[in-house]
Amino acid sequence: MNNWKKFTAACMGVAMVGTTVFGASATVFAADTVTLDVWHQFTDPESAQTQAFEAAVEEYEKEHENIKIELHGLDTESYKTKISTEFASSASGVDVFYYWAPGKLKQLTDADKVLPLNDYVTDDIKSRIKEGSTSNFELDGNLYALPIDSYMMCLFCNKDLFDQAGVEIPTTYDELITAGEALAKLDGVTPLAVGAKDAWLAGALYESLALREVGASEVQSALLGETEFTNEGFKKAAEDVVELYDKGILGKNPLEDGEAEATADFLNGKVAMQLDGSWFAGTIDNAEDSAVKD
């Protein structure tokens, strides 16, 4: 598998909504039971991420007996819809939530719907966070969130199919095109599965190509609304997506399958390359019967 370029929007974290709960005095926290509604995306019980998250919540509740945490877990696309609906109104049922930065987070901070954490994040806490990992959550001089995990978008490759096609695993875009065209000639094989029915994966393909064309700083500026998505590099990234489709590298109908279908085909040896997060390595490793595990 080859590492794919990291995209700015992949940095996610947890932020606190500025409700009266967080304006309460220390005496209230000490005397009364406080319920916090925590929204997240850790829904796979077999995932190490989910298990670590739930263990952290359990430990926190043991250490803070007056705080009860109500968990609200949804898959990515359902989460986006539901959390947007909440914030379109009062978001009274959201206290702590999983979100994307900097662009989408800035929409909420501009609307004054997120609590700045400057007074809560101590130097000790900062010392335990990887340097630079909070930069996307720092807007207008305020820190609004903390990173909950980190990952990269990666290009996972079935080496056996590459050998059958007589091509090497690509390290550049041009090599990706060359390999994809050769792989497309194999019977019943999709060269590159994106799972584009799930919108975030379709976006990840474009985002990765945009990073290649314009660089991380330009992407971040566009996400923050400081520049427009109209320069030639962003246009070229869109043209790259079209090229991949026109050459049959994305399969006949890349919008037909989501991540689950793409994953099944990849594990069954019907897909040569899959674009997914670095967590996908665990999916491969945990699969009982996989054509690519070894």
Placement of each model-derived feature along the sequence:
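Conserved N-terminal structural module of periplasmic/extracytoplasmic solute-binding proteins
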Residues: 9, 23-106, 110-111, 123-126, ...
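Hydrophobic core
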Residues: 12-20
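Extracytoplasmic/periplasmic substrate-binding proteins
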Residues: 41, 104, 239-294
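Short helix-initiation/N-cap motifs at beta->coil->alpha
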Residues: 73-82, 103, 173-177, 253-267
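Short helices/loops that flank or line small-molecule/ion binding pockets
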Residues: 80-92, 161-162, 181-185, 260-274
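Hinge/lid segment of periplasmic solute-binding proteins
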Residues: 100-153, 177, 185, 204-207, ...
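Short, solvent-exposed loop/beta-turn-alpha elements that line the ligand-binding surface or hinge
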Residues: 116-129, 196, 213-236, 286-292
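Glycine-centered hinge/linker elements that transmit conformational signals in sensory
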Residues: 180-182, 223-254
